[in-house]
């Protein structure tokens, strides 16, 4: 038996990017910043790349903004490609989101937008 399941709660690191395909499929990509439970208050968050498909992608595109508090459930996958300049194989971990929970109130989300998370790392 094997299990590939991830549950995270954090804040959107940037506004979602939504792409519509001719086939009718929709994909949404953005980052999630998750703070670790630690006694160090200055520790930076962990960053995760998220990929959401279908109706959930449209919901994320409409309601998630930079700083929004969300919960996700999904699975880990690796995107693989070849570097255009060097031809070196590359890969990066991506979380394929199956369930998205919009957490917090509108006021919480408005305040979070003023949070000082750096853009991407």
UniProtKB/Swiss-Prot annotation:
GO terms for cellular component: nucleoid. One of its GO terms (biological process) is DNA replication. PANTHER family: SINGLE-STRANDED DNA-BINDING PROTEIN (PTHR10302), SINGLE-STRANDED DNA-BINDING PROTEIN, MITOCHONDRIAL (PTHR10302:SF0). The keyword Signal does not apply. Gene3D superfamilies: Nucleic acid-binding proteins (2.40.50.140). The keyword DNA-binding applies. InterPro entries: NA-bd_OB-fold, Primosome_PriB/ssb, ssDNA-bd. Residues 3-104 form the SSB domain. This is Single-stranded DNA-binding protein 1. HAMAP family: SSB. PROSITE patterns: SSB (PS50935).
């Amino acid at each position: 038996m094997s299990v590939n399941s991830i549950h995270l709660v954090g804040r959107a690191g940037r506004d979602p990017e939504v792409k519509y395909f001719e086939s009718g499929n929709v994909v949404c990509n953005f980052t999630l910043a998750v703070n670790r439970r630690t006694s160090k208050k200055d520790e930076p968050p962990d960053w995760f790349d998220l990929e959401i498909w279908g109706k959930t992608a449209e919901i994320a595109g409409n309601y998630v903004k930079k700083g929004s508090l969300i919960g996700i459930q999904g699975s880990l996958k690796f995107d693989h490609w070849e570097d255009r300049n060097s031809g070196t194989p590359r890969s990066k971990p991506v979380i394929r989101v199956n369930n998205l929970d919009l957490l917090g109130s509108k006021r919480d989300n408005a305040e979070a937008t003023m949070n000082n998370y750096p853009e991407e790392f």
